[in-house]
Structure formats: C-alpha cells, structure tokens
Amino acid sequence: VIGAGFGRTGTLSLKEALEKIGYGPCHHMKEVFINADQTEYFYLASMGEKVDWDEVFKDYNSAVDWPAAAYYKELSDKYPDAKVILGMRDANSWYDSASTTIYLMSQNFPKWIRFILPRADKLFKMIDKTVFGEPFSYRFEDRESAIQVFNDHVEEVKRVIPEEKLLMHSAKDGWEPLCAFLDVPVPEEPYPWVNDSKVFA
C-alpha cells in the first residue's frame, strides 16, 4: 500500500490502521528521523540519486506520509500491484495544521545542530527538497499558494492513479471504505484517531 497524501492528512492514524489490518510495518516520516539508513536513502533520492526501493522498503509492507508520498508515482510504477491511498482533508484545515506543527518544527530546528550532526543536515536538506521547499516553490508561508499546491496534488493523484487502484480516504471515514478497498475484515475496535499536534506545541 502506497500513501500519496501529504503530511497532516491523517497519515499517523492511517499508519496505525494499516498495521492493525495486516499491512505493517508501515513506513512513516518517523522512520526517517530515527533510522539512519532511512535518512540516507531519502536524502540520496532527494538529491536525484537512484535508490533501490526494494532495499528502502525491505522491512515494510506499506508506506504513508512524506517523504515516501513524494515518490508515489515512482513507487506505483515500481510496484504495479500496490494500491494507493490518498489521505484527504479540508485544504484550509490542512494548512492550519501543517503550518503550526511540522512546518514550524522544520523552520525552528537549531541550525547549529545541522553543522555538528551530518545526519541532521541531510535530514533537513531532504525536507527542503522533498517536503516544504521545492514542492511549494519556497512559498509555504503564502497560504493561498500552499493550498493551491495541496489541491493540485490531489488532482494529480486522481489523474495519475487508475480509479480501481485509488482510495481517497479521510480519518473520519473510518474502517469500512479502507477495509473494503483492501478486501480485509473490519476490526471491531474503533478506527485509530491519532492527533499528535501536542507534540509540536
């Protein structure tokens, strides 16, 4: 399963959901922060280097969130049988959340740490190339521009991925459409609802 949704579209909830229904471990940006190999893989990819996706995802059965979502087209071509899930959220709500959490963190990270820790420098160079810098033309703080990029991404995914391979899913949709799409039983427990905004406060 390939997640094509931007960060802050319920990706952490989707990660937990996929892991509960047999698609774990699920790759997420958290992996890139804690795993040096993952940092290196996605840094190289962001610099235009060819990476071995089989090696990158050898320990995972699904991937959601940035940075993997930035390569959804390449991954869909590499794994033609994989299904694609596009995390959905109201664009204004998404911007409000992203701009006060993950974007703020990426901008406020102490620059001196990047000078003394090479992995941290690579991590934030990757974020610049893959997440908030180039994809948003370095205008993420321009709300209207960022929301346009968000909406354009949604339309691109709908255009690129065949309808039968794509699920547009919001956390509020719960288990039913997700499980029907993946042809797995619906768990009895509630759909995961992970609101990690407080981590960035």
Model-derived features with residue positions:
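Short His-Asn-centered micro-motif
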Residues: 3-5, 29-30, 64-68, 88-89, ...
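Hydrophobic/aromatic-rich structural module bridging two neighboring secondary-structure elements via a short loop
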Residues: 52, 56-77, 81-84
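The conserved 3'-phosphoadenosine-5'-phosphosulfate
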Residues: 31-40, 85-95, 112, 152-201
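Short active-site oxyanion
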Residues: 1-2, 59-62, 82-83, 163-167
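PAPS-dependent sulfotransferase catalytic core
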Residues: 1-58
